[in-house]
Regions:
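Sequence/structural signature of beta-propeller domains
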Residues: 1-239
Length: 239
């Protein structure tokens, strides 16, 4: 566990974004919000597979070169494969009342695979879509994760966390679920509510689509406290 109480948070790799590649490899991306968090971990399929760590310095340098001209800190929170693209979700953090930089950074999947295997330099970002997620009580929403359903749609989570810094946790005022457009920045969002119909204040930071249906998901809540484990829950989308 990495937190301020233990004094070890600076060593946290912050593997916020995970994706399974077409060859069944699992790739976990550090958020890139600090040099320590510019690492990538891969796990090959098969029994007894070991996790391998590699530097992502050139990857994050390439992403940072395309980041927000307003100076927002790079903070990759989600990754999905959709068609020919590896899509990386940048989470915006900002002051109350200001629009944060939430964006989708698209990299050609075949070029990324070549880089991952050491055959090519890291490919440039080919498409960037800034996404406007709104705010709640003055606190802007920011991406926290994404997943692809069986029918190819990209679902995402966004939380309104009251903090101005990607390295500092803050209270959550609400969460939203949404669908992301394939070739444009359009989104369709809805508030996430609990079993009693009340808006959740949990920090939902993980989502995975269940096999066989595009409206049922598993989600993970990060409690941001070292003495309390993360929670896993079922999310049902009513369309």
């Amino acid at each position: 566990v990495f937190d301020d109480t233990r004094g070890n948070k600076k060593f946290k790799m912050d593997l916020e974004a995970c994706v399974v590649l077409p060859d069944s490899r699992l790739v976990a991306f550090g958020s890139g919000s600090s040099p320590q968090r510019e690492k990538i971990v891969t796990v090959a399929p098969g029994k007894g597979a070991m996790a391998q760590q590699m530097s992502g310095e050139d990857l994050y340098a390439g992403l940072r070169a395309h980041s927000d001209p307003r100076g927002a800190r790079l903070n990759i929170e989600g990754a999905v494969v959709q068609g020919e693209w590896l899509r990386l979700l940048q989470r915006g953090n900002g002051k109350r009342g200001f629009e944060p930089w939430n964006a989708i950074l698209d990299v050609a999947l075949d070029k990324f695979l070549g880089w991952l295997d050491g055959r090519h330099p890291f490919p440039p970002v080919r498409r960037i879509f800034e996404v406007h997620l709104g705010a709640l009580a003055g606190v802007p929403f920011g991406f926290t994760d994404a997943a692809v359903t069986d029918d190819g749609r990209v679902a995402f989570l966004a939380c309104a966390e009251d903090t101005e810094d990607a390295l500092i946790d803050g209270p959550v005022t609400g969460c939203r679920f949404g669908w992301l457009g394939a070739d444009d920045p359009s989104v369709v969002v809805a508030p996430v509510v609990d079993g009693e119909g009340k808006p959740t204040h949990l920090k939902l930071e993980g989502i995975e689509a269940r096999t066989g249906g595009g409206t049922m998901f598993d989600v993970v809540a990060d409690m941001d406290r070292g003495d309390e484990p993360a929670q896993i829950a079922e999310l049902a989308v009513r369309e």
